[in-house]
UniProtKB/Swiss-Prot annotation:
Name the record gives this protein: Ribonuclease D
Compartment(s) of residence: Cytoplasm
InterPro entries: 3'-5'_exonuclease_dom, HRDC-like_sf, HRDC_dom, HRDC_dom_sf, RNase_D, RNase_D-like, RNaseH-like_sf, RNaseH_sf
Organism: Acidiphilium cryptum (strain JF-5)
Cofactor: a divalent metal cation
Length: 392
């Protein structure tokens, strides 16, 4: 068992002056660990409640809702190119900071991604990393606390602080391992994606892609797209979860019925007469009416791939075997190398811009995947192992 490291006592930050002093100290360090606590159950946009920062001699729990607190010093720290910002599973945290400061903290390092590159598998949790790399244990008792309630309890402050204190030895352990294996550049490639604001951008016109659609004609597809885009904009405008505007399962039904009035809206299961006759109902009816007026020639093509475009099952199976072999041999999480969608597209089309054909993924898997697809290599079983065989 590794000796448990000693950490500074956590400090609650509630004033701009205290935050500025903290950020000044952390600006002199090579890295700082970061986490957030937020609420999103009742809003479209996450409500930032707490920010945790961990330095060599500082552990701070910042009350982001403290009256009069200006988070500008935090934004300056996040923009400092000399300080690496270390997160675990950073996407939701980054989304919050992008909304708050208009920029992604950089440079950044995500220990979840690093763990997948360092051989910890697909689904490793933060508590497992803390145990494996730092000999510690994470108390999950306050995981689902109401972080918007004030005052914060001592137990909440201790829980929040633990997320960034243990993250320091986790980061140092992962970085040392990746340095030995020559894989820091791999993690840097992933960090570049995480640092791109486009990664977090929500386009209302693409909202329909989250829905599970079955059948339907081109007109219905146009309606699904229009209704989903309207719902996304409306949810953003009033800052409520999109499901509180119109539920996912109601959108295909609305597209199929294409109601022309409030009474028609109420025929969709779960839509009340109050909604149908109100401002939102009228706006939805306008969207439906304008979409019904689109000429047939301008309707979108239904997203049904022809039989010839479906990925050949045999090739998909071979590519998955190659992926599993390369992931296992190199101790890298398979889903970080290539997704199921990547494999299907690789098997069925010429898609040179797929992530699995770029950078370290190409070296590890993509180049041989193309050779396998082109009939230049084969896969052979050797006992419990799978080997790549060059073909003449």
């Amino acid at each position: 068992m590794k000796p448990s490291p000693s950490f500074p006592e956590p400090v609650l930050i509630e004033t701009t002056e205290a935050l500025a002093a903290l950020c000044d100290r952390l600006a002199a360090e090579p890295f700082v660990t970061v986490d957030t606590e937020f609420m999103r159950e009742k809003t479209y946009f996450p409500e930032l409640c707490v920010v945790q920062l961990g330095g060599a001699n500082d552990v701070a729990v910042i009350d982001a809702q403290a009256e009069g607190l200006d988070l500008a010093p935090l934004g300056a720290l996040f923009a400092n190119p000399a300080v690496t910002k270390v997160f675990h599973a950073c996407r939701q945290d980054i989304e919050i900071f992008l909304l708050k400061f208009g920029a992604v903290p950089a440079p950044l390092f995500d220990t979840q991604v690093a763990a997948m590159v360092a051989g910890f598998g697909d689904q490793v949790g933060y508590d497992t990393l803390v145990s494996s790399l730092a000999g510690g244990r994470i108390d999950k008792a306050h995981r689902f606390s109401d972080w918007s309630a004030r005052p914060l309890s001592r137990a909440q402050i201790a829980y929040a602080a633990a997320d960034v204190t243990w993250l320091r030895p986790v980061y140092e352990g992962l970085r040392a391992r990746l340095t030995r294996e020559g894989r820091l550049d791999w993690v840097a490639e992933e960090a570049a994606v995480l640092a791109d604001p486009a990664t977090y951008r929500t386009e209302p016109e693409d909202a329909w892609r989250r829905l599970k659609l079955r059948g339907g004609n081109r007109r219905q597809l146009a309606l699904v797209k229009a209704i989903a885009a309207w719902r996304e904009r409306e949810a953003m405008r009033v800052n409520v979860p999109r499901q509180r505007i119109v539920r996912d399962e109601q959108i295909p039904e609305l597209a199929a019925l294409a109601p022309a009035d409030a009474e028609g809206l109420t025929r969709v299961r779960g839509i009340s007469s109050g909604f149908a006759g109100g401002k939102s109902g009228r706006a939805l009816l306008e969207v439906i009416a304008s979409t019904k007026a689109i000429p047939d020639a301008e309707l979108p093509e239904a997203p049904r791939a022809p039989e010839s475009a479906r990925p050949p099952a045999g090739l998909v199976a071979l590519l998955k075997v190659l992926l599993a072999e390369r992931a296992g041999a190199n101790h890298v999480a398979a889903r970080l190398i290539a997704s199921a969608e990547d494999i299907d597209r690789l098997a069925s089309e010429d898609a040179p811009n797929l992530p699995c054909l770029q950078g370290w993924r190409a070296e590890l898997f993509g180049n041989d995947a193309l050779r396998l697809k082109g009939g230049r290599i084969a896969l052979a079983a050797r006992g419990r192992r799978v080997e790549v065989v060059d073909l003449p």
